[in-house]
UniProtKB/Swiss-Prot annotation:
Residue ranges, compositional bias (Polar residues): 1-12
InterPro entries per record: OBAP-like
Sequence segments annotated as region (Disordered): 1-22
Protein name as annotated: Oil body-associated protein 1B
Amino acid sequence: MEKAVHSSTTSGPAVPGETTKTGTSIIDTAASAVQSFAPVNQIHQHLCAFHFYADDMARQVEAHHFCSHVNEEMRQCLIYDGPDANARLIGLEYIVSEKLFMTLPDEEKKLWHSHEWEVKGGFLFMPGVPGAIQRKDLDKVAKTYGKVFHFWQVDLGHELPIGLPNVMMAVTRDGQLFHEMIQEAEKRFGVSVEGERDSRAYMSGPELGIHPLANGGGKGMKLELREVDIKPVESVGSVFV
C-alpha cells in the first residue's frame, strides 16, 4: 500500500481561490480593532505531534495543536497542518484528565486515545521551547486522554476539506510512525526524539494504567453517513409567544 503522509504546510497543495483583496484586508483590519477574540486569545501553547487515521495507520499526519485550558482538567486545541501563517485548520482535539475520562460511557471511551507513549516516546514536543520547560507540562499531558477529529484530508492532497470527519489516534508504541516523517520534523524543528525520550524516562502515564477501551479498544474506527427521517418542523415546540 502506498503511504499517505503529510509532514507540513510546505508539502500540501495550494488552496484554490482568489488572493485576498486589499479591500477585504482593510475590512478585516478595521473589524479586528473593535472586536474581541477572547476564545482564540486564550491559546497559550503550541504542541507538535503525529496522528494517524483510526481506520488506517499508514495514513499519518503532522499535527500542530494550538491549545487553551478550559480548566485544570481539560484543554481544547485547534489543529493545523503546520505552524505557519498559511497553515490549514484541519481538526480539533479535546484533552481531559484521567479523572474526567473515567466518567465517560464505555462506548465513548473508544473515541479517545492515551498520551503516555506519545509523550514518553518523545513524539510530542513544543517547538522552540527548551526541553526542561516542556517537560514540566508534558509530565501532566502523559496522564491524559485526547479525542481528535480531522476534517481536511491533507495527506491525500485535497485542496479543500472533503468528506466526513475522521477519527484520529496517536502513537502507542514504537514502530507505528514512518521514520522519514520523524526525521523530517526533527530537522525542521531542531529536536531529537531519542534525546527527549531519555529525558522523559521518569514520567508515568495514567494512575490506573491505560484503559483497555481507549485507543479504539484495539479496533479500527471510521465514521459513516446514513440517511434518516428528518424531524418535521410541526413537531418542534414553538419558541415564540
